A protein has these predicted regions:
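Flexible loop/turn segments at secondary-structure boundaries
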Residues: 1-6, 28-34, 77-83, 137-143, ...
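Aromatic- and acid-rich polysaccharide-binding/catalytic face
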Residues: 8-46, 69-70, 74-79, 91-93, ...
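Active-site-proximal structural segments of metal-dependent nucleotidyl cyclase/transferase enzymes
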Residues: 52
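Aromatic/acidic polysaccharide-binding cleft in carbohydrate-active enzymes
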Residues: 70-195, 201-204
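Acidic, Ser/Thr/Pro-rich beta/coil linker or hinge segments at domain junctions
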Residues: 228-274
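Short Pro-Gly-centered flexible turn/kink motifs
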Residues: 272-284
Length: 286
């Protein structure tokens, strides 16, 4: 938007003393059918967050304030599949009762994008204190239901969200990652591997979330865990598909996570094979 981030600065200068959060919304889509560029969408999300945080801190400094304004990322997801169908409904079939609008059916590559966005949100957990999927059932949602009281079923994007919710509790640890990079149609210096770790002190668990967003090559990830003495490998969960456009349905959920034997520990050093275009959850515990 032409007014971004001036609008945020202007409104915060008038409201700084009365508010605690700035609301952010962002949806992404693969309208150009360019998977490599689509999977760089989390870089845009990262820059979006950094810009809003910088704006909040600028206003804090200008106001000689004492408090940080944090972020509530109220809406985020992939959203584009249903656009044409929705246009047809509104233009050619208006005034229906409960028409099936915004019912995106998500592909496996959408699940990778959602996983990348989750990693980005966790990386910014110091300032992103709230983050919501605004719609949970049917409407750009991880869960779908069939008309007439039929089955409920899980979309591809359900699983990265499940993993982050279940295992992403605790303290987010910013990893120091050395990785090769690539360029896409609209992005430069895109990291081949995106990752973040979460330490749950109460349960003595460490979880690493990682996405290999290259489309051609497996990558070996080496993790130095010598500072986490006593931790052992629990499991390595993977989502990967040869067909990036594969979807789930009420008849068959083809895209599901699986447990693999691709991680091993040796003297505090863990090596993990990240398959091409894959979502990985590596769990460790004492």
């Amino acid at each position: 938007m032409p007014t971004f981030p001036k609008w945020e600065s202007t409104t915060l200068e008038s409201t700084y003393d009365y508010v605690d959060y700035v609301s952010m919304h962002q949806y992404y889509g693969n309208r150009d059918n360019d998977t490599a560029d689509f999977l760089a969408c989390s870089d845009d999300m990262d820059e979006f967050i950094r810009t809003v945080v910088a704006t909040c801190d600028y206003v804090k400094a200008k106001k000689r304030g004492k408090k940080d304004i944090n972020i509530s990322f109220d809406e985020w997801n992939v959203w584009f599949h249903s656009n044409a169908a929705d246009d047809d409904i509104t233009q050619n079939h208006p005034w229906q009762v409960a028409p099936p609008m915004l019912e995106d059916i998500y592909t496996f590559e959408d699940a990778l994008a959602v996983g990348l966005m989750l990693i980005t949100l966790l990386k910014h957990a110091d300032r992103v204190k709230i983050a919501c999927l605004a719609q949970l059932v049917n409407v750009i949602a991880p869960i779908m239901t069939d008309q007439g009281g039929g089955a409920a079923w899980k979309q591809t994007i359900f699983y990265p969200f499940l993993h982050a919710s279940k295992y992403g509790r605790g303290v987010a640890l910013m990893p120091l990652v050395q990785t090769t990079k690539h360029d896409t149609a609209k992005h430069e210096n895109v990291t081949d591997v995106e990752s973040v770790a979460v330490y749950n002190e109460e349960k003595e668990e460490l979880t690493i979330f990682a996405v290999n967003r290259t489309l051609e090559d497996d990558i070996e990830l080496t993790t130095d865990l010598r500072g986490m003495e006593g931790f052992h490998l629990v499991e390595h969960i993977v989502m990967e598909e040869s067909d990036l456009k594969l979807v789930n349905s009420s008849y068959e959920e083809k895209v599901v996570p699986k447990t693999v034997n691709r991680s091993k520990m040796d003297g505090g050093i863990m090596t993990t094979l990240l398959g091409k275009a894959s979502w990985n959850v590596i769990r460790l515990s004492k």
